[in-house]
Structure formats: C-alpha cells, structure tokens
C-alpha cells in the first residue's frame, strides 16, 4: 500500500502558492431579454460603447446601436437562431474592424471581409476600422487628374476625376451597373485598384458581374464585396463601409482606387429596417433621422489626398435607384447633395435604343474640365453645345411643318452626334479613340453619311488610324494635347477612310 508523505504534499502546495499569479479580469456581461427579426434586447452591459461589438454565448456577434436607460438594442451579424432568452452576452471592448492586405485583390468577400469564393482563407497582417474618419480639409487637394470611364458621353461631357464622387442615378433596368462595370474594365493598365460593393443584389447578378470581370482580366485589380438579398440587414448596412476601408488601405499607400456602391438605396432600406425594429422614430418615407449621415460619412471618405500624404485617391461612384424617374425623393436628393455631380440614366432613352442611356441635359459634373486632358477639352466643348442646341431644336421641330435648310442641317448633325455617343456594353474606348470620334462628328465629316452608316464608319476609322496612323495616338498619349500635327494626321485618315468606306458601300 502506497504511503502518503505529508512533507511532499506541503512542498507541492507551497510551490503552487508561490507561483500563483494574481489577476483580476472584469468581463462586462448581460442577459438576453428578447430576440427576433435580427434584433436582440440585452439587460446589463452597463459600460458598453455605441457601435461596440458584443458576443453571444453561442458565438454570434452583434453591434450595440441603441443604448437605453434599462436595456441595450443590439443588431445581429447572423441569423441568431441559436440565441435563447436569458443566455449571456459579453462586451468585447472592440469596434468593428476588418483585416486588410494586397491579398484581397481578385477575391470575392462578404461584409466581414471573409472570402466567399471558395478559394481558401486570406492572410492579412494589418486591420482597419470599418468606420474610419474621412480625411480633413488640409489632407486633401482639389481634383485635377481624369479617371477615364471609357464611355464617350461621360468622358467628354460629364468628366470624372480621381478623388471625385459622381452619382449614377436612374430607374431599374436602365444600365446603371453596366456604366459602373465598364468603368472598372477601362481601368486595366491604368494602375487603379477597384472595389465593387454589391448590396442586397440577387446572387445571380453578382455572379454575372464577377464572371464578366474574370473573362476580361479585370479581377486582377478588383475586390468584390457582396452581401446578397438574403443577407441580414446588418451586413447589408455594413458592406459599403467594408469596401471603403479596403479602398482606404490602398489610398493611404499612395495608390489610386475606384469604389462602386451598387446600390445605396438598398443600404438605406436595410438601415431603415434596423432602425424601425430598434424603435427609433421614423422620419420622411419612414427613414430614420440620421439617414443623411449614413451616406455622408461614407461618401466623404472618397478624396484626393494632398502631396504630403502621397497624392493617393479614392473615387466613389455610388448608384441610387429612382422610382419612375423621381429624382426628388428622399434618398436621391440626399445623395445628390453629397456628391460632386450625377449621371442621370433615363428609361425613355434606354427604350429608344440610346445606350448608355445618359440624359446629358440634367447630368452634371461639378469638377468639370479640371478632370479632362487638354486634347479632350479642345474637342468636347463644341460637342456639348451642339447637342444642347439640337435637343432644343428637336423639340421645336416636332410642331413645325417646313424647316429651312440650315435647321435641317443642324438636326441632321445632331442626330449623327447622338449616334456617335452610342456604345455597346463592355467595349470601353481609350481617350485617343474618343478624341478622334468626337472630332469627326463635330467637324461635319459624318454629315454625308446615312444615320445607320455612322457607327460602322467610326469603328473602321478607329481601326484604320490604329494600323496606318499610329503617330496620332502617340502624340496624344505623350503630350495630352491635340496638336496641329495630330489634327493634320487625323484629317488625312478621315478622308482616306471615307473614300474607302463609300467605295465599299457602293459595291
């Protein structure tokens, strides 16, 4: 039988007492009073911060949004089906943040920056707060470099600059996403990092966009943040801020970024749902009182940084959906007042076959020609004026029976200019091709052609210049100006191609 030695036991106890480390750990906890509809009411959690992350017993994470006298309103970042009344909740002491790194390029992630493309985990050594303060006044400089979208109508008349916020607004099915995705495709080789945020979209639509990017090699420089229609409202509300945090990471590293929020109407609806369930007082259109702040703090994060901070930029293209063309609704007017201009897409133009369906009359860029190269400024001024006069004349001509020759000529020119602005989807043009196209139209070279020949001729002209007059593109890309030499080369090419084209058509 084994003997118990008291001295050995007392020695072990003494050693344990000496090695005892006194540590007091205070955990801020509470209990669930009520849970449902993505909202939980918690009793306790006395020292929780607004916006702090809280963790439920079964692992679900939530954000404390409502701090009331006797309970805390928490929005859940998951379905919360396993949370029970009376289960415990602890405050984490952290505000929502996500990991950030170069490894995110080419990946599809959710609002918590977790990959959802089935290609394994993403390693990141750094993290950023989802809600970061926007750069201050002294940290910015005015927008002066163009961000080419590849769409003639935008680059010529509603130019977008690096660091600008330009709203894309229009009814459903008017090509808003197409304008945004074409802009991403056009950034190939421009050293611009793109972030596409899909909020409350159909999963099939997001898959289509991702496939399009992959086929055209755009995923190499793009990050897709997706929260589909079946995601909890909390995650749909957070997705744009996650996208902005990723874009900021690159902006502060002296890179240029482009971020697309598709679309902010859905984010506002998700926020409205959360606010109403938290019993916050409803305002206009049942949106909460701080819905303006929801979007302003997001869009103010887009900036062109000063030279001291490395001149990085973040250009934002938010998308807002209107109902029956009503731009005076609550969310559209809010976002219009925050952004530096808007591109208005019209259902009538879309149905009339004018695509991209941009209504040039009420679209505007508040940065203007500061975001254009000199060559574009030179040819585009005339285009906008002629199109405005044409729109006025066209409305008047509907009621007039006999028009004089000058008016007929002006109408014919306007129709041809409108034709040259049409572009197929996913076929962006370089700035040199745009300058060439606009010059051909505004200087009357298309007037002798039939309307249905215009686009065919322009496609052939662009190919002809590329192969036979490469010096034209070299001059514009190197000097950024439309020199006399470039003009002479272009005139020569237009005439040579016109002769060939007319002979082909006759044959």
Swiss-Prot record:
One of its GO terms (molecular function) is ATP binding. GO terms for biological process: proton motive force-driven ATP synthesis. Its EC number is 7.1.2.2. Its main location: plastid. Gene3D superfamilies: 2.40.30.20, ATP synthase alpha/beta chain, C-terminal domain, P-loop containing nucleotide triphosphate hydrolases. The record marks 363 as: Required for activity. Produces ATP from ADP in the presence of a proton gradient across the membrane. The alpha chain is a regulatory subunit. HAMAP family: ATP_synth_alpha_bact. Belongs to the ATPase alpha/beta chains family. This is ATP synthase subunit alpha, chloroplastic. It comes from Spinacia oleracea.
């Amino acid at each position: 039988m084994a003997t118990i030695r008291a001295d050995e036991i007392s020695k072990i106890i003494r050693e344990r007492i000496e090695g005892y480390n006194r540590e007091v750990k205070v955990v801020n906890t509470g209990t669930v009073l009520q849970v449902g509809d993505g909202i939980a009411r918690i009793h306790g959690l006395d020292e929780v911060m607004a916006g702090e992350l809280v963790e439920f017993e079964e692992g679900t994470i939530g954000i404390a949004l409502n701090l009331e006298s006797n309970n805390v309103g928490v929005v859940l970042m998951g379905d919360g089906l396993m949370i029970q009344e009376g289960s415990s909740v602890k405050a984490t002491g952290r505000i929502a943040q996500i990991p950030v790194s170069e490894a995110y390029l080419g990946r599809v992630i959710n609002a918590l920056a977790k990959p959802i493309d089935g290609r394994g985990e993403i390693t990141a050594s750094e993290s950023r707060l989802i809600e970061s303060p926007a750069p201050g006044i002294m940290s910015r400089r005015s927008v002066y470099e163009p961000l080419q979208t590849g769409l003639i109508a935008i680059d010529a008349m509603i130019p977008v600059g690096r660091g600008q916020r330009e709203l894309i607004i229009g009814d459903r099915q008017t090509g808003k996403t197409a304008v945004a995705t074409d802009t991403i495709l056009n950034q190939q080789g421009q050293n611009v990092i793109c972030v596409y945020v899909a909020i409350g979209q159909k999963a099939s639509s997001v898959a289509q966009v991702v496939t399009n990017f992959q086929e055209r090699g755009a995923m190499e420089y793009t990050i897709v943040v997706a929260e589909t229609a079946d995601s909890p409202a909390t995650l749909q509300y957070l997705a744009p801020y996650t996208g902005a945090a990723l874009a900021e990471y690159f902006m502060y590293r002296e890179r240029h970024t482009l971020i697309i929020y598709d679309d902010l109407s859905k984010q506002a609806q998700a926020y409205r749902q959360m606010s109403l369930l938290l019993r916050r007082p409803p305002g206009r259109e049942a949106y909460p009182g701080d819905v303006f702040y929801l979007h302003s703090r997001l869009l103010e994060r887009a900036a062109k940084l000063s030279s001291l901070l490395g001149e990085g930029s973040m250009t934002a293209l938010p998308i807002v959906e209107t109902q029956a063309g009503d731009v005076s609704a609550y969310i559209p007017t809010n976002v219009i007042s925050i952004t530096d201009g808007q591109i208005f897409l019209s259902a009538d133009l879309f149905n009339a076959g004018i695509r991209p369906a941009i209504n040039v009359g009420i679209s505007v860029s508040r940065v203007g020609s500061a975001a254009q190269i000199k060559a574009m400024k030179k040819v585009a001024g005339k285009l906008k004026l002629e199109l405005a006069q044409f729109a006025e004349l066209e409305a008047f001509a509907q009621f007039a029976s006999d028009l004089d020759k000058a008016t007929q000529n002006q109408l014919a020119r306007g129709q041809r200019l409108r034709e040259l602005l049409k572009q197929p989807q996913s076929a962006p043009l370089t700035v040199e091709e745009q300058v060439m196209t606009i010059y051909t139209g505004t200087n009357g070279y298309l007037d002798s052609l039939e309307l249905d020949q215009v686009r065919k001729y322009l496609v052939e002209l662009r190919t002809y210049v590329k192969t036979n007059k490469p010096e034209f593109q070299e001059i514009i890309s190197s000097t950024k100006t439309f020199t006399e030499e470039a003009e002479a080369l272009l005139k020569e090419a237009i005439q040579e191609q016109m002769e060939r084209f007319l002979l082909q058509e006759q044959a």
